[in-house]
Amino acid sequence: MVVGMQKKVLTEQALYFGDVSMPKDWEIDQNDLAHHILHSSLTNKKLQFSKTWDKLNTYMREHIGLEYGIQLINKETWGNIYKPTETTIPLLNINPVDLRNSPDYTLLYGVRVDNCFVKIHYDDNRHKGRSWDIPLLNNRFIMFPSTNMYYLINNQKDSLNFVQTITYESF
């Protein structure tokens, strides 16, 4: 029998973000990743496997697993190129009528970015339609539940921004 006041957390919505801190001589080759994103965009084909992408993906899966106990399985991956001053339409990486086969997490990685922000929308109980802005920087990641709508804002006027997206299922 439990006596006194109790608390049970029914749901939690966590965002993970930070640097991709690879060991010396194993750093992510930003130019190689940008090249693959550009090639995929120009040929209108899926992003091809590369050692650089594999290093990034392995790092993320292993570190999220070790730090937070979340085991990740790849669902999909693609790269995007954003024009200067471009703001995307609201993005959602789930299929609302097929949640069972939708990803659990979305990861955004700054391949070659300058003055780029991600606006992530969320609800906080009865406080609906809230959002959080976080800068997306070179060699940094942002990972959040795929049920969150988001969009990217490219604030600068001089260059393209390259962003790698990976979606994951957790188990």
Predicted regions and their residues:
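Non-heme Fe(II)/2-oxoglutarate
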Residues: 1-78, 88
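Generic serine detector
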Residues: 21, 40-41, 50, 102, ...
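Catalytic core of non-heme Fe(II) oxygenases with the double-stranded beta-helix
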Residues: 73, 78-155, 160-162
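Double-stranded beta-helix
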Residues: 165-171
